[in-house]
């Protein structure tokens, strides 16, 4: 699905807009736009919604396009497919990604927010703490295919997966449905999922447990195979400029209360 987003003004106008936004002619050197670039979003709560066509990542992508002056084809696809294409070099960018040892072999990152992860459990599962979920072999966890989380959440998913106690899905909506149907008894959630968690049906039937982990940095994902080191540095500088001038704060303020927004964007 192509969203048909590109920088409509001429490149020089985009460059001038970037200089004005940063208030100085010594702004970051612009990335190479000699070829069309590609960026994939994934549907996930407040990050992006097919239904509304908007979200945090969509806003972030729009601003990257505006500042860089590059033609970037934006599509929507499952997260697992995104990582495959980033690794092969078939995709230049994605957003809101987290790093691990394996991913760092083929992807570079430019951080712009961080958040914590939580375990959402059915109230009738008898789970008071995360360890209770592990100890009960009758309980199953739902997870989005290829997603990684905080260290403790990753250990939980990996341990249960080894015991064949994880049901994988391509997105959040199927997980909520299987949770309400009691086909799974828990799933990993984060702040972008809050609107769904506030629905009466889910709120009445679930409880939230916190993992004892610090917030995990998320950022622009850059394919090392597609983008040379010099270009990665230019895109990272663009992201840093968005953080420095308050643009990232303003994007998150559209979706979260100020206290939570600042906790996520100032790390």
Question: How does the language model describe each region?
Answer:
Residues 41-44, 115-116, 200-239, 256-267:
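Periplasmic-binding protein-like
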Residues 28-105, 168, 245, 255:
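Extracytoplasmic small-molecule ligand-binding "clamshell" domains
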Residues 33-50, 131-149:
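Short loop->beta-strand "edge-of-pocket" segments that line small-molecule binding or catalytic clefts
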Residues 59-70, 110-112, 135-137, 146-169, ...:
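Ligand-binding cleft/hinge of the Venus flytrap
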Residues 11-22:
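Bacterial N-terminal signal peptides
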Residues 75, 80-92, 132-134, 172-193, ...:
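Short helices/loops that flank or line small-molecule/ion binding pockets
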Residues 58-67, 131-140, 147, 220-259:
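Extended ligand-binding regions for polar small-molecule ligands
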Residues 62, 71-135, 146-149, 208-213:
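Acidic, polar ligand-binding/catalytic clefts
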């Amino acid at each position: 699905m192509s969203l048909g987003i590109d920088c409509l003004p001429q490149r020089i106008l985009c460059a001038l807009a970037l200089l004005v936004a940063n208030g100085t002619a010594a702004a970051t050197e612009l990335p190479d736009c000699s070829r069309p670039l590609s960026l994939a979003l994934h549907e996930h709560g407040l990050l992006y919604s097919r239904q509304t066509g908007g979200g945090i990542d969509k806003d972030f992508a729009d601003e990257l396009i505006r500042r860089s002056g590059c033609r970037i084809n934006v599509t929507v696809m499952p997260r697992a497919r995104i990582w495959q294409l980033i690794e092969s070099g078939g995709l230049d960018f994605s957003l809101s990604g987290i790093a691990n040892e394996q991913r760092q072999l083929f992807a570079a990152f430019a951080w712009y927010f961080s958040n914590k992860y939580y375990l959402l459990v059915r109230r009738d599962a008898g789970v008071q703490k995360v360890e209770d979920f592990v100890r009960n072999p009758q309980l199953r966890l739902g997870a989005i295919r290829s997603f990684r989380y905080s260290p403790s959440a990753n250990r939980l998913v990996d341990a249960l997966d080894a015991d064949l106690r994880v049901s994988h899905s391509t997105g959040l909506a199927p997980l909520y449905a299987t949770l309400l149907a009691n086909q799974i008894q828990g799933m990993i959630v984060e702040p972008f999922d809050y609107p769904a968690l506030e629905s009466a049906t889910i709120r009445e039937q679930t409880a939230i447990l916190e993992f004892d982990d610090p917030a995990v940095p998320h950022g622009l994902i850059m394919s090392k195979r597609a983008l040379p080191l010099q270009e990665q540095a230019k895109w990272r500088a663009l992201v840093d400029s968005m953080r420095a001038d308050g643009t990232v704060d303003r994007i998150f303020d559209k979706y979260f209360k100020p206290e939570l927004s600042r906790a996520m964007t100032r790390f």
